[in-house]
Curated annotation (Swiss-Prot):
Protein name: Protein GrpE
Family matches, as Gene3D superfamilies: 3.90.20.20, Head domain of nucleotide exchange factor GrpE
Record has Chaperone as a keyword: yes
This protein's encoding gene: grpE
Alphabetized UniProt keyword annotations: Chaperone, Cytoplasm, Stress response
Lineage of origin: Bacteria, Pseudomonadati, Pseudomonadota, Alphaproteobacteria, Hyphomicrobiales
Originating organism: Rhizobium johnstonii (strain DSM 114642 / LMG 32736 / 3841) (Rhizobium leguminosarum bv. viciae)
Length: 210
């Protein structure tokens, strides 16, 4: 048997078939295995996700800080609201006592009565001053355009000399605390006069800003 016969025999055919099968399996395996992702792209995606998460967390913390500051401010400003509202009844009684004394009585009062009147007036001023130090301010609506946010109309007064719907009388004083109405002023408003001017009216808080 020659060398060519040996090379081309059954063994050679089997070897070639095995090699072909191995190559086929390797090729199929390579096709089935997914391509590996780029690690740099993975890091970029992870970095973007972490950045978005950080920005959301920072925004939530900022909102929480602002909300907490607002709640603390409101708590300080309005914590005395209940007590102040009770003190308004005392202030009302002092004012009624002073209003019950006619100008003639004041003018002819003896020393004892004059001292008593002065004491009541001083007490009223001291109370209003103490309330104002805690953010409670008395409204002065006479001459202002009626504002349902701050005033409660009790009656109308026919008066053609002042603009219609102008506050001309105060029955019970109104008060604010901070930017809220603690108690609206009970007022009488003018009726029958000209319409109020469209010009911008002064806010009840202008005195505070002045």
């Amino acid at each position: 048997m020659t060398d060519d016969t040996t090379k081309n025999g059954p063994d050679a055919t089997a070897a070639d078939a095995a090699a072909d099968a191995t190559a086929y399996v390797e090729n199929e395996t390579a096709q089935q295995e997914p391509a590996q992702p780029d690690p740099i792209e993975l890091l970029k995606a992870e970095n973007g996700e972490l950045r978005d998460r950080y920005l959301r967390l920072a925004a939530e913390m900022d909102n929480l800080r602002r909300r907490t500051e607002r709640e603390v401010k409101d708590a300080k400003s309005y914590s005395v609201a209940g007590f102040a509202r009770d003190m308004l009844a005392v202030s009302d009684n002092l004012r009624r006592a002073l209003d019950a004394i006619s100008p003639e009585t004041k003018a002819t009062a003896d020393a004892g009565l004059s001292t008593l009147i002065e004491g009541v007036e001083m007490t009223e001023r001291a109370m209003l001053s103490a309330l104002e130090r805690h953010g409670v301010r008395k409204l002065e609506p006479v001459g202002q355009k009626f504002d349902p946010n701050f005033h409660q109309a009790m009656f109308e007064v026919p008066n053609p000399d002042v603009p219609n719907n102008t506050v001309v009388q105060v029955v019970q004083a109104g008060f604010t605390i901070g930017e809220r109405v603690l108690r609206p002023a009970m007022v009488g408003v003018a009726k029958g006069g000209p319409k109020p001017a469209e010009a911008e009216t002064n806010s009840v808080f202008d005195e505070k800003d002045a």
